[in-house]
From Swiss-Prot:
Xref: SUPFAM superfamilies: ClpP/crotonase (SSF52096)
EC number from the UniProt entry: 6.4.1.3
Stretches the record annotates as Acyl-CoA binding: 325-358
Family classification: Belongs to the AccD/PCCB family.
Chain ranges of the CoA carboxyltransferase N-terminal domain: 32-290
Catalytic activity: propanoyl-CoA + hydrogencarbonate + ATP = (S)-methylmalonyl-CoA + ADP + phosphate + H(+); butanoyl-CoA + hydrogencarbonate + ATP = (2S)-ethylmalonyl-CoA + ADP + phosphate + H(+)
Functional summary from the UniProt entry: This is one of the 2 subunits of the biotin-dependent propionyl-CoA carboxylase (PCC), a mitochondrial enzyme involved in the catabolism of odd chain fatty acids, branched-chain amino acids isoleucine, threonine, methionine, and valine and other metabolites. Propionyl-CoA carboxylase catalyzes the carboxylation of propionyl-CoA/propanoyl-CoA to D-methylmalonyl-CoA/(S)-methylmalonyl-CoA.
Phenotype when changing R410W: In PA-2; no effect on affinity for propionyl-CoA; decreased reaction kinetics for the propionyl-CoA carboxylase activity; decreased thermostability affecting holoenzyme oligomerization
The organism's taxonomic lineage, starting at the top: Eukaryota, Metazoa, Chordata, Craniata, Vertebrata
The protein's name: Propionyl-CoA carboxylase beta chain, mitochondrial
Taxonomic source organism: Homo sapiens (Human)
Amino acid sequence: MAAALRVAAVGARLSVLASGLRAAVRSLCSQATSVNERIENKRRTALLGGGQRRIDAQHKRGKLTARERISLLLDPGSFVESDMFVEHRCADFGMAADKNKFPGDSVVTGRGRINGRLVYVFSQDFTVFGGSLSGAHAQKICKIMDQAITVGAPVIGLNDSGGARIQEGVESLAGYADIFLRNVTASGVIPQISLIMGPCAGGAVYSPALTDFTFMVKDTSYLFITGPDVVKSVTNEDVTQEELGGAKTHTTMSGVAHRAFENDVDALCNLRDFFNYLPLSSQDPAPVRECHDPSDRLVPELDTIVPLESTKAYNMVDIIHSVVDEREFFEIMPNYAKNIIVGFARMNGRTVGIVGNQPKVASGCLDINSSVKGARFVRFCDAFNIPLITFVDVPGFLPGTAQEYGGIIRHGAKLLYAFAEATVPKVTVITRKAYGGAYDVMSSKHLCGDTNYAWPTAEIAVMGAKGAVEIIFKGHENVEAAQAEYIEKFANPFPAAVRGFVDDIIQPSSTRARICCDLDVLASKKVQRPWRKHANIPL
């Protein structure tokens, strides 16, 4: 009897315990369902950014949203977002209210792929607080930049921001500095690209300025330190946003931006094409594309492209298109310092950097702006192991007080320094004039050019015949005869060739074949330089 009672008591306790367990399980399941619902709600909220009304306003401005831009830039389905649930930490000025909390804050960050190649990206969301930068916003950007440096992958920033978030005060300024530091740390390690797709003002402008390439969208993007209202109050100048910091200003006058595109879609599609020229990092080679353009292809039209009259202009871009693969050339800064041409192309499938003087503009003279433009490009190519092809037709440095007062000596030295410092394969082709110090600067043999060619039309000399005759034959009765004598002796490729300053005098039609062959040989080039902390380029 007693045993039966004990069994009954144990059974009762077990029944109570089981009931409690069932209740606990139901509670846990309910909690899990609640958490999952919250997660999904947060995701839906994050995907909407600042809400449908603000998305509609963004579209009315002719602009895509932050997420639409990422979707168009990256391969379909490749985007892996990070920090979607991050929110700002500001509690002042009513910012702690739920209505002022947006999952992801005002920037979308993550990684994805462009034509199968890894890239990290951040896209500022103008629909959330005007894309303004908070401490959390900066933290998200810094996190993906750190990851990109660690794994060796490029960073692309899609900028559309009203500036620092005033409510956060100095924390926003600290956030900018954190980003700037990473821009500098990543420089020369991974490619960094900025695409300005809206406003970018105040301290925000320095991050794009520190990146390797800055592109803009016409009519909707602006870059300036201080806006029109501040300019008016300080200098009494009346200027519009477009005039002060629009795409035209920065691609034609300041040189801050490298190219401008018609709209968001055009910009993002071109950015995908541009990305294909670049290596993932300084430790990786540039991608090699299958080439259907024969490497030994002759270009007969080049034999007559240089005019017989040395003062007559021609278009160096035509020469570049003729020798590169499939005539494809992605020019950088095409509307700034037009007397020098820089850009990317492929030779037998390999990415190469092209530098060339433009006889159509200022006779191809080097000046302050062209020297800085060329130097910056050469240094990028050298940092990322991209071979350099240089086409030379340069009568010298542009004379005048404006150039001298502006510091042409220092700025011209930048281009010289960049070519001398570069250890990548360097092939130089002198098509016509190579006069004076400008001859030395343009990737000459004396600056460790690997292969230096001259066309039969090349004139390699201290200066042009007219100027030389006025000095050498001053007071000579027959000036024309003296000039002819000088041309015969010096204004041709032979004086340089007999001294080994050019490796060969080639027929222009064979230029592509010779360059492709040289690049094959130079692919294994290695150069050891003395150790130093860093160089001191004449800034």
